[in-house]
Amino acid sequence: MTAEEKSVLSLFMIGVLIVVGKVLAGGEPITPRLFIGRMLLGGFVSMVAGVVLVQFPDLSLPAVCGIGSMLGIAGYQVIEIAIQRRFKGRGKQ
């Protein structure tokens, strides 16, 4: 496995672990669909941090992982809220 592949996998796992922690700490009931969906969304949103390497190719892995953590925490919630609003808007029509 190359260093780039390890970086992408690290970012994905960071996002997944952040979401697992948030789901387990939250008060809402956990369903398998919700759990798996949020894990995938958090993982893929964290992987977006790899785009930073295009602008800053010499950025260290801990810095990229920090950006991935930030996106994993805030990014998936923004996307989830946008999706919920979109589907609620369709239901009212």
From Swiss-Prot:
Major subcellular site: host cell
Periplasmic side: 1-6, 55-62
Cytoplasmic compartment residues: 28-33, 84-93
Membrane-topology descriptor: Multi-pass membrane protein
Molecular function GO labels: pore-forming activity
Ranges annotated as spanning the membrane: 7-27, 34-54, 63-83
Pfam families for the chain: Phage_holin_3_2 (PF04550)
Location within or outside the cell: Host cell inner membrane
GO CC terms, sorted: host cell plasma membrane; membrane
Keyword terms: Cytolysis, Host cell inner membrane, Host cell lysis by virus, Host cell membrane, Host membrane, Membrane, Transmembrane, Transmembrane helix, Viral release from host cell
BP terms from Gene Ontology: viral release via pore formation in host cell membrane
Complex formation: Homomultimer. Interacts with antiholin; this interaction blocks the holin homomultimerization and delays host cell lysis.
Stated role: Accumulates harmlessly in the cytoplasmic membrane until it reaches a critical concentration that triggers the formation of micron-scale pores (holes) causing host cell membrane disruption and endolysin escape into the periplasmic space. Determines the precise timing of host cell lysis. Participates with the endolysin and spanin proteins in the sequential events which lead to the programmed host cell lysis releasing the mature viral particles from the host cell.
Family: Belongs to the P2likevirus holin family.
Domain notes: The C-terminus acts as a cytoplasmic regulatory region.
Protein name per the record: Holin
Organism: Escherichia phage P2
